[in-house]
Amino acid sequence: MFEPTPKQFGVFWEFIENPTVTDIDYNGRELWITDLKKGKYKKNITLSDSFISTFTHNIANSVNGNLNKVNKILEADTKELRISVIHDSVATSGISICIRKSPCLIRNTIDEMIKEKYCPEMILQLLINCVRVNMNFVFGGEPGAGKTECAKFFMQFIRPEDRVITIEDSLEIHYREINPGADAVELKVGDGFTYTDAIKASLRQNPKWLMLSEARSTEVTSLLEQWSTGVHGFTTIHLDDLRKLPDRIQNMMNNVNDAARMENRIYRYVDVGILVKRHVDQNGQIHRKMDQV
């Protein structure tokens, strides 16, 4: 992890500093910006080959990495940025750059969620109370729907004395920053330390809550095992319909021989499922809401 500077990011910097910008995407030809207020739009800026080369070189140096025909993918994290670059030897349309912002704040507030019709006030209060009585949550949605932001909102209702362990490959939750004074441990997985390793190690750290940034594969088995011991938690998952959640989790589990037992475990330990969706209106504005609970 490194500290970003205007010199490193060049023309990207103005968008990084803009608090309403969430994503900066370059497809090899055009620069696309995703803004909370304006929606997604193309910026009329021409990025020279020289700038792109300098930018990728700066990022590679910051993480002691390389971007070339051998190392085709470059990934880097700062405290609030997740950067992904794909080399033009495989991105035939030109080098591809994605910068996603994950600020150390909770974007959603109760008043704004009600005003923007994110969900009915009655449902919102019910879900807040579900957190307070230690229920397990799974937040579903498609990429960019706002699953993590929704999870971060509900995390603020966890008691500060409850030890929370977050497990992420890219640090997006920022639990200690959004809940100052809370008992929290933040784990980052990577080479030699998998999600499953982190989940199993967490059991010896006296957690009350275990937060998995995203359930993608067989680590969901270990997560459910942890929840079965009385540890509570949140996770997010790619999903387009909440009714598919049990099958989606079951397909990721590494034990398919006893399907009935696995299905029973899912229904037993997943207390609350929330599907978050986003849509773009005719003016290009992005709107998010809880579509299913």
Regions found by a protein language model. Name each.
Residues M1-T22, V63-V70:
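Phosphate-interacting basic helix/loop segments used at nucleotide- and nucleic-acid interfaces
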Residues W32-V133:
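P-loop NTP-binding catalytic core
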Residues F139-G141:
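Hydrophobic anchor at the beta1->P-loop junction of P-loop NTPases
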Residues G144:
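Walker A (P-loop) phosphate-binding loop of P-loop NTPases
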Residues K147:
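Conserved lysine of the Walker
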Residues C150, F154:
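Hydrophobic positions on the alpha1 helix immediately C-terminal to the Walker A/P-loop
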Residues M155-R265, R278:
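Switch/coupling sub-region of P-loop NTPases
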Residues Y267-V293:
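Conserved P-loop NTPase
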